[in-house]
Amino acid sequence: MFRITDFTYEGKTVFLRADLNSPVEKGRITSDARFRAVLPTIQHLLDNGAKLVIATHQSRPYKGDYITTEEHAQILSRLLGQEVEYVEDIFGKYARERISSLKPGEAIILENLRFSAEEVFNRSIEECEKTFFVRKLAPLIDYVVNDAFATAHRSQPSLVGFARLKPMIMGKLMETEVDALSKAYESEERPRVYVLGGAKVDDSLRVAENVLRKGKADLILTGGLVGQIFTLAKGFDLGDANIEFLHRKGLLELVDWAEKILDEFYPYVRTPVDFAIDYKGERLEVDLLGGEKRLFDQYPILDIGSRTVEKYREILIGAKIIVANGPMGVFEREEFAVGTVGVFRAIGESPAFSVVGGGHSIASIYRYNITGISHISTGGGAMLSFFAGEELPVLKALKISYERFKDRVKE
C-alpha cells in the first residue's frame, strides 16, 4: 500500500477522505478528537503544496446528528490556523468549479457526503467506480488520500471508488492504525489477551472465534453485554430482568453461537464471576454463585464486579499483547464505571503492547484520564472487522490501487 511519503504534492489536487463523523448535541459538535487525529495528514499535504479537497460523512439520514459540514470547516480552520472553506456542494457544478480554482496550499471541505444517495449504500469497487460522484470528480483529482480508518469496513464511492482510477494513498492516521493493529494481530509474543465488552455482541463473537481458531489469542476476557451472553452460554441464570433486556435487544439468539465457541475453546474464554446491579439507585455487587443472585430477577446488571476486575487485572498485568474493544459496563454512571476504569487502567499499567478501540472505550479513557495504552484506535466496527479476520474494503482498495499505480511513486 502507498504511504503518504511515496509522492510529491506540489500543485497537485488531492482528495482527502477523512472520517470527521463526530458527536453532536443541540446541533453543535461536542468533540474535536477526530479532527485532531487527521491534522498530521492535512498539515503534511498543505505544507507540500497540495490543493486539498477534504471530504467526510456525518451520521446518516434522519438522525439527530445528521448535519452539514459547515461547523467541520470552522473547527478545521481553527486547528490549522488557516481557512478551510465550506463548499455547500458535493460533486455538482459549484463543487467542481471550486476544486478547479484551488491554489497550492489551499483547502476546502465538501458538503456531508451522505447528503448524496450514492454514498449511503455499500457496493463493489466496480459499482462505486460508475457512480456520478466518482465520474464527476475523478477528472479533477491527481491523488486520493484515505485517512478514514473508522470507516474502513464500508465500501462506498468516496472510500473505494477511485482506487483503479487514481493512486490511492494511506494517510498518516490510516498508516498508524494499520501498523498498530497488524502488530497486535501478527505478534508471536505471549500471552496475547483480548478483552471484549460493550454491546456489539455479534462482532465480538466473530473476533473471538477468529483469534482463537487461528491461534492469535491465548485468553479472552469478557464484559458488558458480551460477557452476559457468554455467561448465559456457560449455563448461569442472569434472572428475568436481564433476560428480558437481552431479548428486547435481540441478543438471546446469539447464546447458541457463544455455546459453540465455548464447546471448542472453553478454557480460553473467561467470564465475570460477579456483577454489579442497580439496586434501588445504588451499586450492589452480586456473586454469580452467591445467594443474592435472585436479585437478578428484578434489577439490571450494569457492570462487572470488583472480584472480576481483580482477576482480569492479574491476567492483564502479565500479558505481552492486549487488544480491547468495548466497556465493561455503563461507565457513563460513575458508580458503574468501576469495571471499565479498573480494566482499562490495568491495560495502561501493563507492559504489554496494547490496542484499545471503540467509541465508548475511547470516551471512558479520556473521561477518566487513563494513560499508558500503546495505541488508541479511532475504529470501532472497523477494528472489530480487522480482528475478525475480515478483509476491510478500504484496505483492499488501497492494495488494488498500489498494484495499478506502483510505477508512479515519487512522480
From Swiss-Prot:
**GO CC annotations?**
cytosol
EC nos: 2.7.2.3
Under the GO molecular function aspect, what terms does this record hold?
Answer: ADP binding; ATP binding; phosphoglycerate kinase activity
List the Pfam families hit by this protein, alphabetically. Answer: PGK
Instruction: Name where it's found.
Output: Cytoplasm
The entry marks the following residues as binding ATP, namely: E332, G358, G359, H360, S361
Decide whether keyword ATP-binding is in the record: yes
Which terms does the UniProt entry file under GO BP? gluconeogenesis; glycolytic process
What are the protein's UniProt keywords?
A: ATP-binding, Cytoplasm, Glycolysis, Kinase, Nucleotide-binding, Transferase
Reactions catalysed according to its record: (2R)-3-phosphoglycerate + ATP = (2R)-3-phospho-glyceroyl phosphate + ADP
Top-level taxon of the source organism: Archaea
The primary site where this protein sits is cytoplasm
The membrane spanning regions, by residue number, are none
Q: Which residues bind substrate?
A: D19, L20, N21, R34, H57, Q58, S59, R60, R114, R154
InterPro entries xref list: Phosphoglycerate_kinase (IPR001576), Phosphoglycerate_kinase_CS (IPR015911), Phosphoglycerate_kinase_N (IPR015824), Phosphoglycerate_kinase_sf (IPR036043)
**Pathway listed for it?**
Carbohydrate degradation; glycolysis; pyruvate from D-glyceraldehyde 3-phosphate: step 2/5
| SUPFAM superfamilies assigned to the protein according to its UniProt record, in alphabetical order | Phosphoglycerate kinase
Q: Which family does it belong to?
A: Belongs to the phosphoglycerate kinase family.
The subunit field of the Swiss-Prot or TrEMBL record says: Monomer.
Q: Which HAMAP family match?
A: Phosphoglyc_kinase
Its name, as the record gives it, is: Phosphoglycerate kinase
Protein's organism:
Thermococcus kodakarensis (strain ATCC BAA-918 / JCM 12380 / KOD1)
